[in-house]
Each structure stands twice: as C-alpha cells, then as structure tokens.
Amino acid sequence: MEFQLTKAKAEEASLLTSLIREIWNGMEQQEWFAPEEGENYIRQLIEQDKGVAWIATDTASEKIAGLFLIVYPGKDNPDNLGRDISLPEHELNLVAHMDTAVVHPSFRGYGLQRKLTAKAEEELRAAGYRYLLCTVHPDNCFSRINMEKAGYRCVKQVLKYGGLPRLILMKEV
C-alpha cells in the first residue's frame, strides 16, 4: 500500500472528527484515549494556525488511513504540557503538543504513526520548536513504544483530562 502524507484543510475537520470517534468507539480501553477534539476545535485549530493535522491517505482508495494532530499551545495556555514538566516561562513558546494520533484498523501495520510523527517533527524543527511533548496512558504500550522508538522519553507521570493517569513524553529537537 502507498500513502500520501498531507496537511488537512479546515473543511476536512468533519472527516477527521469522524475518524477519531470511530477509533475511540472501537477501543476496548477507552480511558487510554481522551478524544476532546470536536469538529469546531479542529477547524479552529487549523484556521487560526494554532496547530496542524497531518493525514495519511491511502492512494488506491483515497480514504484517510490515519491522522496526527499537532497543537501549538503557546506560552499563555494553562494546558501547555511544558508547565507540567517545569519548563521555564521563556521556553513555553517552544513547545508543541503531539496531540492525537489515530490509524484506522484497516491500515494498521504500515508504520503510519511513525511516518506521520516524522513528517510533523520535520516541520516543527524547521519552525523552531524545541520541545515536542505528548501524553500516553501508562498501560497503552503500543503508543508508548511507538513514541519511544521515535526518540521520546518519559519525563513525568501526571493526572490529566479529568483525573486520568498519563505519562508525559518529551523529545528535544
């Protein structure tokens, strides 16, 4: 299979939201994933340049196979994960959240999360971001191992998203 990696457009927010919900609805351990991203959230994120959604599209079927949502929280955002790991105030603008990664079950096993991560990191590095942070449920070995293989390391365990346990993983670029 071949996949094309592109940035999503704001008008694709509904498709992305549907994919996220489909994945979440099919999960046995739904507490591993906190899908806060509604259609309006994703649309505004893209339109207001507060983030980007990278999508992998299967070139044969033209179906969206996976997505990786990146958020630029900014230093004034109280949810900036840099605050959780005690980054200095002047470094908080250098933080990007590797926020939501999903791959449709039909397209798993092709390394799409790794490919989407690498594509996003390349752009973030060029844009001057230094700290790439994400959260993973401690029992979600698949996501944790994927991120660790990409060079992320666990820096803290916290309660997030209404009291759910999460590991904060970081990669400096």
Can you say where each PLM-predicted feature lies in the sequence?
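Conserved N-terminal entry element of GNAT/NAT acetyltransferase domains
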Residues: 1-14, 18, 22-25
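Conserved GNAT-fold acetyl-CoA-binding loop/helix
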Residues: 21-44
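A short helix-loop-beta-strand connector motif used in the catalytic cores of GNAT acetyltransferases and
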Residues: 43-55, 71-77, 97
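Conserved acyl-donor/pantetheine-binding loop and adjacent beta-alpha core of acyl/acetyltransferases
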Residues: 63, 69-100, 161
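Conserved acetyl-CoA-binding loop-helix of GNAT-fold acetyltransferases
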Residues: 100-103, 109-122, 145, 149
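Conserved beta-strand-loop-alpha-helix junction that forms the acyl-donor binding cleft
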Residues: 108, 134-144, 161-162
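Conserved active-site alpha-helix within GNAT-family acetyltransferase domains
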Residues: 114, 126, 138-156
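Conserved GNAT acetyl-CoA-binding A-motif
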Residues: 124-136
